[in-house]
Amino acid sequence: MAHDQPLLVVQEALRKCFPVVEEQQNLWQSTLQDCSPLLSSLSNLAEQLQAAQSLRFEDVPALRPFPDLQERLRRKQLEAGDVVLDKLAERLATLLKVRNTINSHVEQVFQAYEQHAAVLDIDTVLRPSVVSPSVADMLEWLQDIDRHYGSSYLKRKYLLSSIHWGDLASIQALPKAWDQISENECQTLVSDVLVSVSFFLEEPGGCAASGDLEHHS
C-alpha cells in the first residue's frame, strides 16, 4: 500500500477541507440574511431623506416656529444611516473572514497535491471510484468554490463602498442590487459539490481501497 500513500495524503487534505467549506457556507448564508434588513433600513432612510428634501418646511405654518427643524431631522437621519453602515461593515468583515478561511484551506489542499504530484499516478487522479469523484474533479470544484467566494465578496464590498448620501436613489436601490449579485451567481454551486462528495467524506480511505481493488481485479 506504500504506493497509495501520496494519494491518501491528498484525500485526507480533501476530507479536511470540504467540512470547512460547509461550515463557512452556513456562516456566509446567515451573514447575507443578516444584511437584508440592514439594507432595507438604509433604503428606507434614503427615501425619508429624499421626502424631507422635497418638502419646503417654511411653507408649512405649523413648522415655521422651528426654522432649524429640517436640518436637525436630516442630521438624525444621517446618524441613523451611519449606525446601519457600521453594522453592514461588520457583516462585510465576516464575509471576508469566510472568503479567507476557504481560500486558506483550498491552498492547503493544493499544496498537498503539488508536494506529491510527481509520484501520483495520473490515471488514479483522474479515476472516480464507487464512493468518490476523482481527485481531479474535487480539486477543480475547490477552485470553483474559492473563485466563487472571492468574486462574490469583492462585488459586495464594491457595492457597499459606493454608498454616499449624495446619491439617495442608489441607496434606495441597494436591496435590489445586493440581491442581484446572488441571482447572477450559481446559487447551488457549493451545495451541489457537498452532495457529490458526501459519500467520499463518510468513507475514510475508501477511495484508495477501491482504486487498489480495481488495479487487482
From Swiss-Prot:
Coiled coil: none annotated. Its main location: nucleus. InterPro entries: CA109-like. Keywords: Cytoplasm, Nucleus, Phosphoprotein, Ribosome biogenesis. GO terms for cellular component: cytoplasm; cytosol; nucleolus; nucleoplasm; nucleus. The lineage of its organism: Eukaryota, Metazoa, Chordata, Craniata, Vertebrata. Signal peptide: none annotated. It is found in: Nucleus; Cytoplasm. Phosphorylated on serines by CK2 kinase. Part of the 55LCC heterohexameric ATPase complex composed at least of AIRIM, AFG2A, AFG2B and CINP. Does not associate with pre-60S ribosomal particles. It comes from the Eukaryota. This is AFG2-interacting ribosome maturation factor. GO terms for biological process: ribosomal large subunit biogenesis. The gene is Airim. Transmembrane segments: none annotated. Part of the 55LCC heterohexameric ATPase complex which is chromatin-associated and promotes replisome proteostasis to maintain replication fork progression and genome stability. Required for replication fork progression, sister chromatid cohesion, and chromosome stability. The ATPase activity is specifically enhanced by replication fork DNA and is coupled to cysteine protease-dependent cleavage of replisome substrates in response to replication fork damage.
